[in-house]
A protein has these predicted regions:
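Rossmann-like dinucleotide/flavin-binding elements
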Residues: 247-279, 285, 320-335, 343-357, ...
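N-terminal Rossmann-like NAD(P) cofactor-binding module of classical short-chain dehydrogenase/reductase
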Residues: 340
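Short amphipathic alpha-helical segments and helix-helix/interface helices
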Residues: 109, 145, 193, 308-309, ...
Length: 403
């Protein structure tokens, strides 16, 4: 049965934390964290909403902060000057949080301001902190975190959907932060800092804020990244996200279709040194991502196309043919050694889908049926409209908003 921690439990927890810090030191870690946010144990002690204790660990703000203070002090004692001790701390909470509780978070930070070696600042709201680009602008947490450096001399790390080097540099130069916390951007491009340092901004695979990386936590699936298709493959021997084996023949390759898959195949084959022809039926390249970027809030998705085009345009061994629809005979007549079919797919208009695995057979005659492809092409229906969403992901809501 759940119960409140007694004094013995707290002593045991502190012992576990000290031993963990010592193991990190012995393993040559540079930083050891005291994690006081995101609903973990220390968050429960800090909040008056969850800490109902009547002993020295409950009641006043000072008492509710006692365990956090003890862990910081004991961790510093254990690691000595071998490791820095950082505190992950929230300066804001859920949308319904009272102003009094928000003020208390700030008062506590001032009270502990000089105790750790580094402050890693966030807000206690995953929805906003890890917000998708559809709803949250880049650097959207600045208003919550801009005060932190005014109350401590210690280095400060902040987060908040950073993607652009310009935004990152701006916050550092304006004294908002000392370090940028960039988890999703480093998933999209592990070499982001080096590319900024080297001035290779056009080579950065900027995060698009779609959060496909984070969805795996809830679905129990391996991590993925729309911008970085090699993400999650670190287990492979000699794996490197940007180093690909050179070509092993003089074969020529035809890639049919310049959507995301076709562009990535062309980029990778071109990097390997193969002669590549990329044929696209339309004038505009990018396929579905170009169209989806026109939907409300998805403009940043166009980076999937832009990054790959920028890389392809540098390659003298790649030819791009726009407005070049190919039949099967056309493909064979090219005489290439290999063909990559990357023509993608279109949305069906007969109701066939995941939960309805057969076409509708009872639609009224004359019913104006449109697909997401039609909506993205500018065919907006007039009058009352029913949206049948068998995808249950993002498209149904976006089509509704677009209409």
């Amino acid at each position: 049965q759940p119960r409140s921690m007694d004094k013995a439990d707290i002593r045991e927890f502190r012992r576990w934390h000290r031993e963990a810090a010592l193991r990190a030191k012995q393993a040559d870690f540079d930083i050891v964290y005291v994690y006081a946010t995101h609903g973990y144990l220390l968050s429960h002690f800090l909040s008056p909403q969850t800490n109902l204790r009547t002993d020295e660990y409950g009641g006043s703000m000072e008492n509710r902060t006692r365990l956090l203070r003890e862990l910081i002090e004991e961790t510093k004692e254990v690691v000595g000057d071998r490791c820095a001790v950082a505190v992950r701390y929230s300066v804001g909470g859920d949308d319904g949080e009272t102003s009094q509780l928000t003020e208390e978070r700030r008062d506590r930070l001032e009270m502990l301001a000089e105790l750790p070696d580094l402050w890693d600042i966030n807000i206690n709201n995953y929805y906003q902190e890890m917000g998708v680009s559809r709803f949250f602008r880049e650097g959207s947490l600045e208003e919550h975190m801009s005060f932190v450096k005014s109350v401590t001399t210690k280095p400060v790390v902040t987060v908040g959907r950073f993607t652009s080097p310009d935004t990152m540099a701006s916050q550092v130069k304006r004294g908002i932060t000392d370090f940028i916390g960039a988890a999703r951007p480093s998933i999209a491009d592990p070499f982001l800092p080096n590319k900024i340092k080297e001035g290779r901004l056009e080579d950065i695979r900027e995060c698009i804020g779609c959060n496909i990386c984070y969805t795996g936590d809830g679905l129990g699936t391996p991590i993925r990244c729309t911008q970085n298709p090699t993400m999650g493959e670190e287990y492979r021997r000699n794996w490197h996200p940007e180093v690909i084996a050179n070509k092993d023949s003089d074969s020529q390759v035809l890639v049919v279709g310049a959507g995301p898959a076709g562009l990535e195949a062309t980029r990778a084959l071109g990097q390997r040194g193969y002669r590549v022809m990329l044929a696209e039926a339309m004038r505009e390249l990018g396929g579905r991502v170009t169209h989806e970027a026109t939907l409300p809030g998805l403009v940043e998705w166009v980076r999937v196309r832009d990054y790959r085009l920028q890389q392809i345009e540098k390659m003298t061994n790649v030819e791009v043919f726009r407005e070049s629809e190919l039949s099967a005979d056309d493909v064979f007549s090219t005489g290439v050694d290999h063909v990559v079919i990357a023509t993608g797919a279109t949305w069906r208009a007969d109701g066939f889908g995941r939960s309805h695995p057969y076409p509708f057979d009872s639609l009224a005659a004359g019913t104006n049926i449109l697909t997401p492809d039609d909506i993205m092409a500018g065919r907006i229906p007039q009058g009352p409209t029913l949206i049948y969403d068998d995808d249950s992901f993002y498209m149904g809501g976006l089509v509704a908003e677009k209409i």
